[in-house]
């Protein structure tokens, strides 16, 4: 009624009380309404400005998904979506060490819950004021990452049971030449040859093997084109297989994907009609030349059917990883008889052309994405026969810096790919979301220790803010390296009269800091070099050669000991140091490194895992040292150290 009587009257007129006044009083409405409207517009603009600022602040505070570890790496695939989810049941030891009754909080009275909360808070205060996070766990300072979901008891038991069923490479359904290559070349010199945990899980899965209750590994039915002569040529190709290998650093992922790839390569080669016909023609030519040894007729060799068309392509982010993976593949190729080629920025254009387009053919190609993408632009057929594509260090190659180059390569090769394998030691949320949307049927093979630094790596913390360093990290770093060198100099090596050389890696956050720290260490008598993005590829490979070698380095024991020379000319001859950024923290198999110094505290726990993962590889012991200053988060370092001691995954 009131609204109908007033008619269409603005809010300013209603507030002024002149809505029902005489017509003569309407002259005052425009001025009053204009003033109120102006203030209303200012209020709305200020509210919208503050709201936009709040949104921008929230957007700034949100951690990028590429810097956050995923908590659902081992989730089931979309193929299991039609199954009814199983009820998660606690294991038989779930009730041990409980301090609070396992009641449903909703059924308890409010008073009892308040009393229990008060008791817990007072207990935490008596224990030194330890604060808990939102989820009740002790990792509160690591709020830049979200907590990883704990592996269920049933899943952990199942994975460990699978791992215990395999204790030898003889249990894998490998071709004789591939098995011989693994035992006599790739693992030559090892006394106790056993598969690592990721190899026990990944190799059978990539080979298509299943396990019985009390039997050894059995093979599935082979595809129609894997060797059966009765297979119809018009039969549809088998479906593409997609795998994610997620395991801790230094666990042997390279051999885990190389061995099945070699096995599939040799099986396909034995049934390829083009290769069979080519081998027959070559045999006839050799027989003809043997009958006429004096013949001077020289025929041009026929190009191999695999010329410039490899079957296996392996992508890695750096030239160092090209050399590292290439060495393992070459060792297998010597016995398995495969043509492996490596291309990187260290090679000239002529060498790359001779290797890729050689008439002898190519079976396995190991390259960086940028180099392979440039070749594929001018020669698209190079990816036309790829049956196995491996993306190593997938968290880097599918990140923002590489994804624009890596994704087109995957798209070009997808029509012919039989098996797609992605490997990484850390799975950020961005990569997890990408795989869930792009490859929803991908099978995820994860080890129980994913996102955890091995317990065999000890972590020490040096508070640089205290005496005698007084905030000088350069002095603290040099002192730590001198302590390591002098300790090693007190013990003789395997040869009498010689001491072992300690190879140490120092990690910094900024590229400019590498040269500064390296120069300071040189001034203190330490053999140190800087490794960063501006260092040439050849120089990088040269510096990392001694750090990736498994051979022991030793020098004659100096007179008077390692540090027995006069102070004016003190040197530390039994140490070699590389000062590097995260360029050297991804994938490089630094078997000789036992000590890692973190000059700067890493920005994320992902960098913690990769940097400390340079030590203690392949079951060896290692030690990490973190230099903590006043500007660093000491609580984060303390929680990382505690999680390493407990063998827990980082958050």
Curated annotation (Swiss-Prot):
Function recorded in the entry: ATP-binding RNA helicase involved in mitochondrial RNA metabolism. Required for maintenance of mitochondrial DNA.
Low complexity: bias regions: 224-233
Entry EC no(s): 3.6.4.13
Biased composition (Polar residues): 45-56
Class of the enzyme per the UniProt entry, highest EC level: hydrolase
Organism per entry: Pyricularia oryzae (strain 70-15 / ATCC MYA-4617 / FGSC 8958) (Rice blast fungus)
Protein family: Belongs to the DEAD box helicase family. MRH4 subfamily.
Catalytic reaction equation(s): ATP + H2O = ADP + phosphate + H(+)
Cellular component annotations (GO), alphabetically ordered: mitochondrion
Domain notes: The Q motif is unique to and characteristic of the DEAD box family of RNA helicases and controls ATP binding and hydrolysis.
The entry's keywords: ATP-binding, Helicase, Hydrolase, Mitochondrion, Nucleotide-binding, RNA-binding, Transit peptide
Organism placement in taxonomy: Eukaryota, Fungi, Dikarya, Ascomycota, Pezizomycotina
Biased composition range(s): Basic and acidic residues: 72-83, 124-137
UniProt motif Q motif: location: 167-200
Residue ranges constituting the Helicase ATP-binding domain according to the UniProt record: 234-445
Motif (DEAD box): 392-395
Protein name: ATP-dependent RNA helicase MRH4, mitochondrial
A molecular function (GO) term: ATP hydrolysis activity
Region ranges (Disordered): 45-137, 210-241
